[in-house]
Amino acid sequence: MLARQTPLHGDHSRQNQCPNSFGHCTSDKSIYDSAQRAGLIVRGSANGDVGTWIFYDTASQTLTLDRSRSGNIRFSNAFSKQHIVYMPLENGKLRLTVLVDRNSVEVFTGDGRTVITDLIFPAPDDNRVSVFADNGEATFSDMTITRLADPRAKQ
C-alpha cells in the first residue's frame, strides 16, 4: 500500500519502489484542489529520466498517458508518444485504476467508460511509482498498489 492519503502542495512529488514490474494501482479519489497538473509516474527509473506519466490537466480537462520517456521509443517514427482524452472531473475528483506490467500500461476511469492502453519499453530496473502535483495542490486518497502475480511463475 502506497498511502491512505497523499496530499501534495506546489511542485512536489513522492516516490516508492515497487517490488517488481507487475502492479495494480487504484486511486479512488484524486482531488485536484488547485494543481494545474497532477498524476503519477509508473515504471520510473531511480534518476527520474525514465517513466510513463499519467496525469490530469485541469485547464484542458484532459487525462494524458505520456510515454515519451518510457524507455526504448526510437524503434519507429510512427510511435505515438501521448494519448490524450477529454475527461471532465466529477465533483473535482478523478478515480483511476491503472494496471502496469513489464511492457504495458492500462488506465481506466469513469467506471471503465474511458480506457487508455499503451505498450512501454522500460528497463527491468525501472520499477518506481511516483505521484506529483504542478503549480498547486492535489490530494491522492485511498491509493493502493497491489502486486500482481507473475504469469511466468510456476504455481
Predicted segments — roles?
Residues 1-155:
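Beta-rich accessory regions
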